[in-house]
Amino acid sequence: MIDSNFAGNAAYTFPHFLGPIKEQRNLALEYFKRAVDVSLELGTDIIGSPAGGMSNKVSYDSKLREEAYKELLEYLFVLAEYASKSGIKEIQIEATPLETEFPHSPGASLKLMEDLSGSSIPYKLLIDWGHALFSPLLKEEADIDIWFEKCKKHIGGIHLQQTDGLYDRHWDFTNPNGIITPEKILEATKKSGLDDIYQYLEVVTAYEEKDEIVFKNMKKTMEFLHKNLGV
């Protein structure tokens, strides 16, 4: 069963709806319309992706940042209308660990959802454990409990990874330097009422790693998670 169709690493090659020129932003709309079409062909009615990335010049200029945000909303409303007419039921936006993207914090995530509340179909958040715990950016808000509590009614999915909170690691669960424990996963999701939300394992291995090592560590990771999460 395919539950949803989510953009992968290739999506990060492009700035999408926050690109510096109009042509890029328009192409992003076509890209996501095609994602809608492909998702329906695959038999799923949920799509998701990060929204895009700004330049530093735009991100750190309050006026330009606000203009970019308003245009992002316009594109997302248009995309939702197309997706709704096509048969998609939900679009998920991933919160990322970069201030040059929307959204990047619990507050920004909540604001985005509120600003999109009138869209043709619901927008939801995709929260990534590693992004939510990225302390260099989030400081005291690098706390999964804060994210879950503030955003819980808007969360449609969760990305699960192992990390140290210093970078967006996307380690598997064999890494001894990780700070995410099964106990915390269970406790945080239960406390916030999110224990029925799908958590998708998202591991990004080094491109140089040998296939047999990747396979071995992924097998150990899945065994570890199944055993300790009771699934």
Locations of regions flagged by a protein language model:
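Hydrophobic residues in well-ordered beta-strands that form the structural core
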Residues: 4-6, 48, 93, 127, ...
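Short hydrophobic/aromatic-rich motifs at helix boundaries and adjacent loops
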Residues: 6-9, 50-53, 80-85, 157-159, ...
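Active-site-proximal loop/turn and secondary-structure-junction residues that shape catalytic pockets
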Residues: 8-13, 51-55, 95-99, 129-133, ...
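Short secondary-structure transition/capping segments
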Residues: 15-18, 59-62, 170-172, 211-212
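Histidine-acidic metal/acid-base catalytic patches
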Residues: 43-45, 77, 103-231
